[in-house]
């Protein structure tokens, strides 16, 4: 059953970064009244954030805000990755809906102490809510198993002392690992390797299979001048996310005969459909409004089938760790 809340449920948020700002704007669009904000204890930014975003109550201690759960109906945790897990462990004791920023923890093993099936916790993998991703899932579900390929040209560099800085893989690439898990209904890794053993910064690949038989390859082409992308090939059609916010469906090829200007025959894929972000995804950070609506849905007794769970967060981290295990 849903909880009894006012027409504008009260939201509390922990965090004052740009991501927190996007959450505030999206939550208001979804019908929340954003009444409370906290940051790290004795934060120097929380009062200014509250003033700039017209939030009436600024808290000096995020843990105190969480324990005063009678003051709010739902909570967003958008603080630093290192602080998220402890705050979440406290927040779940309230029994109230929580939206927590990905990846939740730095290591998947840190999640083992949580109830990963807790229905009141959503993980903020906002790309699941893209119109392009919904179309990709529909495309996959409409036919036989497909051939799926994903490029992850993450920025991976070496620190001054030569150590490989892999934090972006845990903090950002996990978005793509989660998308694959979401689209294909779970994946089993069948192989993973580097291009050159001992040269992890050169990148590598993973291959996976889904339960229904889709074959998936993942290129971790670090630092390549390319967009994150995902392609699905099946029965003479290609569904492409490039960048992930925009989907294009291709069917057939146009043959352009040689000319005096270009003396070679060209084969051009024919785009038959394009899916672009709807207006509310353009005005706000893509996926955030529908994600906030999913949080509000928990108050009304409805769990979004799209939103990520803590189990999904663990799976995404395990994918990242499989690749990072080759790199370390």
Regions found by a protein language model. Name each.
Residues 82, 105-160:
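A contiguous active-site-proximal alpha/beta segment in oxidoreductase catalytic domains
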Residues 110, 129-136, 144, 172-180, ...:
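Internal, well-ordered alpha-helical segments in soluble enzyme and binding-protein domains
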């Amino acid at each position: 059953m849903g909880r009894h809340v006012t027409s504008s449920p009260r939201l509390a948020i922990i965090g004052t970064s740009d991501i927190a700002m996007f959450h505030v704007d999206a939550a208001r669009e979804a019908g929340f009244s954003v009444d409370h904000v906290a940051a790290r204890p004795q934060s120097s930014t929380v009062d200014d954030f509250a003033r700039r975003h017209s939030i009436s109550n600024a808290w000096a201690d995020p843990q105190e805000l969480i324990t005063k759960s009678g003051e709010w109906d739902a909570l967003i945790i958008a603080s630093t990755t290192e602080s998220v897990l402890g705050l979440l462990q406290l927040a779940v004791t309230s029994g109230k809906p929580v939206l927590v920023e990905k990846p939740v923890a730095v290591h998947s093993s840190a999640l083992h102490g949580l109830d990963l099936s807790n229905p009141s916790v959503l993980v903020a993998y906002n790309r699941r809510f893209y119109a392009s991703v919904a179309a990709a899932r529909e495309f996959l579900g409409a036919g036989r198993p497909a051939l799926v390929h994903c490029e992850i040209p993450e920025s991976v560099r070496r620190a001054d002392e030569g150590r490989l800085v892999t934090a972006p893989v845990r903090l950002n690439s996990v978005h793509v690992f989660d998308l694959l898990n979401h689209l294909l209904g779970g994946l089993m890794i069948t192989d993973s390797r580097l291009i050159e053993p001992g040269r992890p910064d050169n990148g590598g690949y993973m291959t996976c299979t889904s339960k229904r038989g889709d074959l998936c390859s993942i290129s971790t082409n670090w630092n390549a001048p390319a967009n994150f992308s995902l392609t699905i090939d099946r029965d003479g059609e290609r569904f492409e996310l490039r960048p992930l916010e925009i989907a294009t469906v291709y069917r057939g090829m146009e043959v352009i005969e040689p000319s005096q200007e270009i003396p070679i025959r060209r084969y051009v894929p024919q785009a038959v459909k394009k899916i672009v972000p709807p207006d509310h995804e353009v005005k706000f950070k893509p996926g955030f409004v529908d994600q906030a609506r999913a949080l509000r849905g928990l108050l009304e007794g409805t769990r979004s089938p799209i939103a990520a769970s803590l189990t999904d967060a663990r799976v995404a981290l395990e994918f990242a760790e499989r690749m990072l295990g080759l790199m370390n």
